[in-house]
Amino acid sequence: MAQTEKKAGLLRRTSSSKKPLKEKVVLMYDEIFMKEDPTKNSPRFWDELFLMKVNLEYLEGKLESLDGDEFMKIKDNINSLFHHCVQALAEEHQIKVVNALQTLCALFRGVHQKNKSATGFDIINMLIGFDKAELRMKELMESLDSLLCGDGSESLKSLCLKLLLCLVTVTDNISQNTILEYVMINSIFEAILQILSDVSSRSQHGYDSVVLLALLVNYRKYESVNPYIVKLSIVDDEPTLDGLGMVIHHALTEYNRQYKEKEEENQGGFFSTLSSMVGSMFIADADEKLSVQTNEAILLALYEAVHLNRNFITVLAQSHPEIDMAATPATPVPASPTTPLGTTPPSLDLMNNPELPLDPNLQTSNLLITFLKYSSIVMQDTKDEHRLNSARLCLIILTCIAEDQYADAFLHDDNMNFRVNLHRMPMRHRKKAADKNIPCRPLVCAVLDLMVEFVVTHMMKEFPMDLYVRCVQIIHKLICYQKKCRVRLHYTWRELWSALINLLKFLLSNETGLLAKHNIFQLALQVVNLFNMFITYGDTFLPTPSSYDELYYEIIRMHQVFDNLYCMVLRVSTNAGQWKEPASKVTHALVNVRAIINHFNPKIESYAAVNHISQLSEDQVLEVVRSNYDTLTLKLQDGLDQFERYSEQPREAGFFKELVRSISLNVRKNVSLTTMSQDVLLKEFSSIS
């Protein structure tokens, strides 16, 4: 009996001996699913229907239970239901509007769920009627636009956004959702911008608005002109762009906070004790306990903003106090059902409150810092496809930032120094860096730290080649800017050089296994050319002459790695095979590195012999280097400071299609009109006649 009740919707028992009675709304739904026009026997049928509390489960279930032939028999009634839902949105009676919005959601979901194989045009015909579709959808979008932009209830606005999210995500592939053509024609872009630019509405609806915008931008973006892409690319209104940045910033901040909380819990707990007892063999297990589900929807919104809108770059650098989200009492905001577990957006009132006490010693932050911290967490673990994609998206965003002139200017600005506490993967051979020891530096140092951290920590069997290539490209783009603008950055360059040499060492040690899956010569060439950049132009951007000397010291100290690399690429390039050409490019690229090694090594050996020293100190090697620069001959290499600019299509199109599909499925799973309790809504509007 309990099973029957669940299936039939909300049922009411009169007594244990009598059959349970169906509630009135369920009986009215049943009438719609009969062939006859329900108004035949009840002229006020539609008026009454929208005064009834919606039974979403029953209505969706009923739609899903029909096969194609059965559906076509009641198509006129379904079209009529859709039409009256749209009409009800213009009613002054708020309860009718609430019920109409929820009914529309059930219609969109139910019809699509049952007819997954049907074409978009068939779906439109079943749901709206093809001849009336343009008019009905225009009316629907205008009503939603009015509700979102009006001074009405915040709950209604929330419901409108949830309906739109429901509509956008009913198909697995967003670009196959033909109904969205009407959302393109009847744009709600301005309504979304209005929400983002207003402090109050942003705090309540910002998250859903940003996710909705990110999805709409990806509708048929490669096949046709998408008006949301065009409009987003030209937004120059500061409050709107700030609002967009604020929503993204807070979603990422909340993720970082949750991760930090979990990390602190674990440090004082069982895994910490166990690790200290038996070494670090359990670190991987302990680390997995820290995983908080990543938030690709917000990351996609950040990507689209950075990629499409040059004005948004300024938002990345806007400073504001860094507030401990856990310690600050926040006005509770209902968790957005589109938010995955672990990414509930915090109250945006925290940053919007002008009365916040500003402590002069308070660390300042900005969206870029928050994003770098987020990336440092996400990029730690790339073992599964989901996290790998998250890390890839972070690196794509950083690629767009690294090749933007304005972004590079503030990244390297000596007057904008920040202390950025990146998360570092637990490793046996290194201690955890104390946060307070991190100096205030230009932001580019944090970006380089993040790249070095990734290079050092992902040399493993399941080698993420694509991420490594992107990482090295980001470093290259930053160095190109430094060379071009003669920026002498005070950075621990030795850590970068050491990480890159160890990467080459790893490629050599795992040549056979890696070559079965990857073109390792492409990555090796990029790394060698980074060294060529330092060798050829280092005197124009390294901070001091001694930094340039240290570069030579590192190359000489680790000469065995470069010698082995040369032997390997020479062997491969002299044999016929698929890697002949890429290997020969590395051979040519090594000319200056080999010249340095072959020039200085005999001089160092001679110095040691003359002075009867078995092992030279670093200072002694540096002395030999400085005294013998004048006799060193290097070859001028062209194109070292050139790079291919990022382009989404065609290279990244497949990645973004799959990413949007994954986000869409997640939003569909989490968007639920029942989470915004009907009882709460109806109670809110019960006094409105």
Curated annotation (Swiss-Prot):
Protein's name in the database: Armadillo-like helical domain-containing protein 3
GO biological process terms on file: regulation of Golgi organization
PANTHER family: ARMADILLO-LIKE HELICAL DOMAIN-CONTAINING PROTEIN 3
Membrane-related topology note: Single-pass membrane protein
InterPro entries assigned: ARM-type_fold, ARMD3-like, ARMH3_C
Primary residence: Golgi
Top-level taxon: Eukaryota
Keywords, in A-Z order: Cytoplasm, Golgi apparatus, Membrane, Transmembrane, Transmembrane helix
Segments passing through the bilayer: 520-538
Cited function: May be involved in Golgi maintenance and protein secretion.
Gene: armh3
Location in the cell: Golgi apparatus membrane; Cytoplasm
Pfam family, one: ARMH3_C
SUPFAM superfamilies, A to Z: ARM repeat (SSF48371)
One GO term describing the cellular component: cytosol
Organism: Danio rerio (Zebrafish)
Similarity comment: family membership: Belongs to the ARMH3 family.
